[in-house]
Amino acid sequence: MKRSLSGIQPSGILHIGNYFGAMKQFIDLQDDYDGFYFIADYHSLTSLTKAETLKENTYNIVLDYLAIGLDPNKSTIFLQSNVPEHTELTWLLSNITPVGLLERGHSYKDKIAKGIPSNTGLLTYPVLMAADILIYDSDIVPVGKDQKQHLEMTRDIAMKFNQQYEVEFFKLPEPLILDDSAIVPGTDGQKMSKSYNNTINMFATKKKLKEQVMSIVTDSTPLEEPKNPDNNIAKIYALFNNIDKQNELKEKFLAGNFGYGHAKTELLNSILEYFGKAREKREELEKDIDYVKYVLNEGSKKTRAIAIEKINKAKEIVGLIGNIY
């Protein structure tokens, strides 16, 4: 079975845009691939500076993924920082990676343009990402179109290592481009993103979830008048309902005497129904953090055994003599 690897940054609370953009597809993949899913806590240090926030986010991300269906019996879930061989390999790869390659990174240039202070971690982010992928001989890496360049850089780094040391050591991973056709609009109509503060969080309390849904921006068409059915509420509603339900909502908008508030209530109910079992499961998992720790520890043991074997071979290739005691 081919191996799939995905990194999940604990950078904040997950929302329905994350779910339909990547999470759901990760879950669907686990029946067909040997899935490795790691919490990219080292990567998150390029943007998170508060220790308590990182700790809280890390547990929350694991809870979210377990709740929506990531199965530890099918997939391996682990912490990046629990496998120090990632950073060991990063150093080996750093010595054959041109600085110019890193400076041309779209993500790096975009963050600098936004005024984010440049530091070594931000610049060398793709080298650590390459190590994350290459150390497990990953066959595929599910990525969005905006992340494809990072995987291309991983392939470039792997090829350069293989060429420099005249070996066929690192497998060249293939991208599995995630379907982003269902771009989820946020409450303000832009793409849903934590950066825009326009998210709807599927695991929020019912009160908070209602506040988020009710904050969806609409026009000022009076209650009694027909409304354009191609609106934000309808677009989000379509993610949770079949075509018949979508057509029913459309007819209500066109008929008039159906307000946006009514539509938002129907959307809220759809979200609660869709994520009902996941919300219940998450509440149960919150009461059993020891189980969450167990899942992470077991995953880290498994992956570290693989990583140790790979890094030892890499050290031998570059001429490091290893343990002499």
Please place each PLM-identified region on the residue numbering.
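A generic structural motif
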Residues: 10, 141-142, 198
